[in-house]
Amino acid sequence: MKNSEDMVKRSVNRRSFLRNGVLAGGAAVAGAGLLSSGKTMLAQENDDARGSLDRGDVAILRFVAAAEIIESDLWQQYAELGGITSDSSTNPYQAAFQVLDSDGLQYITSNTNDEISHATFLNAYLESKGEEPVNLDEFRTLQGSQATGAQNIGRLTNLMHLTVDTSWYIRYRSTTNPDFGATYPQALTITNRTSIPITDADFDNQMHIQAIANTAAFHFGTVEQAGSSLYASLGQKVTHAEVLEITLGIGADEVAHFLEWWILPATPSPDRRSRITD
């Protein structure tokens, strides 16, 4: 995680709750019932915030720490090539993001730093409770981009052969609700596409590099909506008040990230902004 640290320096099922609770007599009544069963969501009143953690809470923290490390890995790849750089020059990939949003480069860098801080904090918290931190370094074996700006290091994630779930784009613009059985098609099909330039040759064609950035724009939303759902789900299963605070806090940050990205692929624009193939 050294490279990541350097960048910093720079169950209550929601669907069953809605179906059963709301239909049984309204959200207020169902909410009261939910709170009365408090142990799955809140710690006991006499729970010592400094005490040891329940095994289930440790498992949840280790799971989300692993997820944040993986998320940090993919965002770091985006930041190296498409985020804020130390010099004033802009490569064609960065320029393609600026076509979508003039602040796109800052968003990418900020999102990256946030994800790295999440992973760092979760591991530090685990250690403070006498638990083993999560380390995935042995799995950093994938080849990343060889374009100028990318670090020559092993990766956990491969952004050069992506299949992206784009159904969220329809879901979050729909008047229907998945909690009541609604399903959503793909907004468009993204299969085996790269979302980062693979070599400097990808910089040479404007339409081509714009298609790569457009693919990334959909991937950003896919990643962050998943993170938002993850913390909302797992937060309902913890028993320690302090762990609940952590899941709520980081989960809220994931929601904020999604709010940055959900609109990006919808930018009203010429055709070159909406293409994912060139």
Where are these regions (language model features)?
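All-alpha RGS (Regulator of G-protein Signaling) helical domain and cognate RGS-like helical scaffolds
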Residues: 2-8, 19-26, 40-278
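Cell-wall glycan-active module
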Residues: 35
